Each structure stands twice: as structure tokens, then as C-alpha cells.
């Protein structure tokens, strides 16, 4: 087994899970948010394609990265590193010279250390997942009640989510049936890859909330969360898996194990915030969607008498929305502050809120000549707590801005995500929109009353909007309308998940 370098402490533990004994190398990490996965099945060595393919998912997490390959001796090698203080490439540069084979998978994981290596009645395999299981406690208890087994407890008392997925797979007699069992039993969202000694299983979330695409070149195939991750590696688009679709990939072919389902609910936030500008989901490019989104905002503003001197976006994801607004409105696009990109990652990644706020402030450097005495229309991808955007607004005022008009690129976030956990908020009351609703309505708010605050044509919504504006010190505030935002994708609205904005499943 390959040494783990400066990764988190590891202990190999023999034990049982589900109805079957197996051994698993376990990591003492907790947490279940976003991440990215990549796999390669090739007639030639996969090491470089795997290295760069996983690295192209670094925008989806800043905590841990992991690689696993099936080596020439038919055994699995793995390396996992903490990447919170240095980029993926610098941590894995030396490892990749020693990890060779024709099959490999890897991930960027924003807490949970992956891939896991497993030995069970199904044989040896490696697994990596993206998503969140909201009925984890129930499933764990069901498995414990059904058999004399155990789960390895991580620090903080959490059960490793991917270990639970392994337990569900091991309840069946084949890996393919085990993956189907996962899709049937979990609530939430899971997209995964399972690497055996014969090939790689890829399975998209049952409702397609997260993507999984396949690229092809002469030597073989790759599987990827992000469609842009394989472009520079010489792969061409082969197919995008549909919701719930399962495939088995070898260097020679892609075999469909389960056809896609009819119902799609892909996360709209992939376009608004998560996705890298070069990525495409369901054939819709992220950058283009953000241009469309900004254009819709501009058309709504044309009905009012707002005449800013310039349009600016909060880097990075707000920038393309602002370009779209500027192109549509004719108001000049400007960069009144610049993100210092060499060292600062996305600010929502640290677990400490004060640290996130500090990073959000430190990474933006003002351009005084573009701010002083200007009326600025500022677009951010969203408002979650509101803390960082308020501080950014105050920062603009302190730098001499005359007015700051704010246009978030999505509606007010009213519900915590049950499927991807894009925010580290522990309670819906962390969301500024919900705090304001509680301020007006008290703690016990019925769904009917809450629905009024989600409707931009109601007095309740207007009252909430004005209160948020005052609390965050904006000159004016106008959120994106849900229909306009969905229209920006060009997809049927029924294909898009809108739970965090209107609570609809």
C-alpha cells in the first residue's frame, strides 16, 4: 500500500459492515458538503490524466484531495492529502510519479477524506462520492438493527457518509445491484464512482441533481463531474449521464447498466455559483447562462429609474452576471475592486465564520479611481447570511462610492439545501431572508405565510426586501425573479431544482 504522505492520520481497521465482513481504511474527518470526482479507464497509464482531471475540480472544494489507482500488480494504491493550505497540484506532484495503472479515480472533497478502499464479499474496490444523505442516521440504525456489525466513528461522532454508501452496496450480491440499492434507499443526493479490478462504475444521482459526464479519446474514457475537466487532456464529449443512469467503463467501452430515469431536478445553483465558467450542464454553458441572467436583471431594471455609472460583479461568480447586465443595459462594466487570485480561495470554505469574513475582505483590493463619487450597481451570485456583502458595500462607501445598488443573481434563499449543502449554515435562521421573516412573524411561521414572502408580487415580499436593504446598507436592492433566473438556463423549469428558493421538492 502506498504511503499517505502528509495526509490525515490513518488507521487500517478490520471489521464488518452491513451483512458482510470487510476491511476499510478509515479517515478521522467529518463533514459532507460539495466536491468533485474524476475517473479514467485507459489502455495507457492514467496517472497524468487523473492528476490534472481531479485538479480541474479544485474550485469545488479546498479541504482534501484524493487519488486511487489500480496498479500493475492488481492492487489499489491511494494517496489523500489536506489541501486547505496549499493547492492540489503541489500536494500530489510527487505522488503521481509513483501511482501508475490503467484505472484510476480521484476527488476533491470539502471534508470527507476519499476515495475509500474496501474489501468485501464483492471483492476489493475503491469508491468516491459527491452529495449528502439526509436520512443517514435512519439508514445506519437500520443496518445496525439488521446485523451484528459496526461503523467506524469519526471525530465529532459522525459516520463517514461514503462508508454508509459502501454498506448499502454490500447488501446486494453485485456492485451494480448495490448501487441501485443506494439510489432506492437514500434521501438527498449521491453521485458516485466505484473502481473494481475490471473497470469503473459511474452512477449519477437518481434525480440528476449533480452531473456526471463521459469523455472519450483513442486510449480510453474518462468520467467527470465537470465537463471542462478533460478538454485539455484530449478527450471529446461522449455522453452526459441522465438522472439515475449507471454505466460500467473500461478502456474499450462504456456499458449501460441502468437507463436514465424520466425525472430531472438538477441543481440550479450549479450555474449561479458552483460551476466553473467553462463547464456545461445539460448542454448549457455556465458563463453563457450568467450572461443571460444578468441580461434579465437589466431588463427588469429598465422599468425603473436606476442609472448607475457602472456595473460591477463580486468576483468570481458575480462577474459574468455583471457582464450580462452591462451588455444588455449599455451601462459600462467596471472592476472597482480586484480579487487577489494568487493566494485566496473561495471564502465560504473555512469552517469559522469570522475567518470566512476576513478572507472575503482581504482578497478584494479596491481601485479608488473607479469607486470615488460613483453610483455602482453591484451583482453578487446570492445573499446567504448577508454579512460579507454588507461589509463589501461598506467597503465601497469607505472608498468613496456615492451609491451602491445591489442585484443578487438569484431570489432570496429561504430554505437550507437538503441535497448538496452549498452553505455551511447550521440553521435556516442563519439565512438573512428567514431572519427577517422571523423578525416580522415570530418563530412559528406557517408554510402559507412563508409562501407569501417567496412571492415577489406580495406586500410581504416588498416589506422583507426593504428590511434586508436597510440592514445591509444598500441604496437599492432587487433580487432576481425565480422565473427570469430559470429562463436564463433555457431549460424546462420542471428540470431544475428550486428548493432553496421556494421550498418545492
Protein language model annotation of sequence segments:
Residues 19, 26-242, 248-309, 314, ...:
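Conserved short alpha-helical segments that host acidic/polar catalytic motifs at enzyme active sites
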Residues 45-47, 135, 201, 209-210, ...:
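Flexible loop/turn segments at secondary-structure boundaries
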Residues 198-199, 234-240, 393-505:
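PRPP-dependent phosphoribosyltransferase catalytic core
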Amino acid at each position: 500500500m502506498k504511503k499517505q504522505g502528509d495526509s490525515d492520520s490513518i488507521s487500517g481497521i478490520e471489521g464488518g459492515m452491513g451483512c458482510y465482513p470487510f476491511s476499510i481504511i478509515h479517515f478521522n474527518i467529518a463533514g459532507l458538503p460539495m466536491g468533485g470526482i474524476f475517473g479514467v479507464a485507459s489502455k495507457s497509464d492514467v496517472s497524468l490524466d487523473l492528476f490534472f482531471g481531479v485538479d480541474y475540480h479544485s474550485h469545488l472544494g479546498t479541504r482534501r484531495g484524493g487519488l486511487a489507482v489500480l496498479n500493475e500488480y492488481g492492487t489499489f494504491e491511494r494517496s489523500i492529502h489536506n489541501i486547505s493550505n496549499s493547492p492540489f497540484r503541489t500536494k500530489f506532484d510527487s505522488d503521481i510519479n509513483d501511482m501508475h495503472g490503467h484505472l484510476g479515480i480521484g476527488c476533491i472533497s470539502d471534508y470527507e477524506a476519499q476515495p475509500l478502499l474496501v474489501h468485501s464479499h464483492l471483492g476489493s474496490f475503491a469508491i468516491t462520492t459527491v452529495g449528502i444523505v439526509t436520512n443517514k442516521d435512519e439508514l445506519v440504525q437500520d443496518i445496525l438493527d439488521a446485523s451484528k456489525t459496526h461503523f467506524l466513528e469519526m471525530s465529532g461522532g459522525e459516520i463517514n457518509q461514503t462508508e454508509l454508501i459502501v454498506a448499502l452496496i454490500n447488501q446486494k450480491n453485485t456492485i451494480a445491484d448495490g448501487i441501485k440499492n443506494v439510489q432506492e434507499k437514500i434521501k438527498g443526493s449521491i453521485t458516485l464512482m466505484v473502481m473494481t479490478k475490471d473497470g469503473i462504475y459511474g452512477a449519477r444521482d437518481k434525480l440528476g441533481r449533480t452531473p456526471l459526464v463521459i469523455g472519450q479519446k483513442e486510449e480510453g474514457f474518462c468520467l467527470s463531474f465537470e465537463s471542462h475537466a478533460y478538454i485539455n487532456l484530449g478527450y471529446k464529449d461522449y455522453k452526459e449521464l441522465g438522472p439515475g443512469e449507471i454505466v460500467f467503463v473500461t478502456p474499450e467501452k462504456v456499458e449501460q447498466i441502468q437507463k436514465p430515469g424520466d425525472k430531472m431536478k438538477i441543481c440550479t445553483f450549479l450555474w449561479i455559483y458552483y460551476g466553473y465558467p467553462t463547464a456545461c450542464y445539460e448542454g448549457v454553458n455556465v458563463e453563457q447562462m450568467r450572461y443571460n441572467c444578468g441580461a434579465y436583471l437589466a431588463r427588469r431594471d429598465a422599468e425603473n429609474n436606476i442609472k448607475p455609472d457602472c456595473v460591477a460583479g463580486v468576483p468570481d461568480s458575480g462577474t459574468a452576471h455583471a457582464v450580462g447586465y452591462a451588455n444588455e443595459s449599455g451601462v459600462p462594466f467596471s472592476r472597482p475592486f480586484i480579487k487577489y487570485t494568487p493566494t485566496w480561495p473561495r471564502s465560504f470554505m473555512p469552517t469559522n465564520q469570522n475567518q470566512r469574513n476576513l478572507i472575503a475582505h482581504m482578497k478584494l483590493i479596491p481601485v479608488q479611481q473607479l469607486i470615488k463619487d460613483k453610483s455602482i450597481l453591484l451583482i453578487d451570485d446570492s445573499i446567504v447570511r448577508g454579512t460579507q456583502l454588507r461589509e463589501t458595500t461598506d467597503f465601497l462607501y469607505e472608498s468613496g462610492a456615492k451609491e451602491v445598488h445591489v442585484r443578487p443573481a438569484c431570489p432570496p434563499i429561504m430554505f437550507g439545501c437538503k441535497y448538496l449543502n452549498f452553505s455551511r449554515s447550521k440553521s435556516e435562521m442563519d439565512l438573512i431572508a428567514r431572519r427577517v421573516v422571523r423578525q416580522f412573524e415570530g418563530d412559528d411561521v406557517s408554510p402559507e405565510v412563508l409562501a407569501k414572502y417567496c412571492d415577489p408580487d406580495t406586500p410581504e415580499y416588498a416589506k422583507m426586501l426593504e428590511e434586508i436593504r436597510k440592514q445591509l446598507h444598500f441604496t437599492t436592492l432587487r433580487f432576481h425573479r425565480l422565473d427570469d433566473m430559470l429562463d436564463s438556463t433555457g431549460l424546462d423549469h420542471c428540470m431544475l431544482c428550486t428548493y432553496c428558493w421556494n421550498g418545492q421538492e
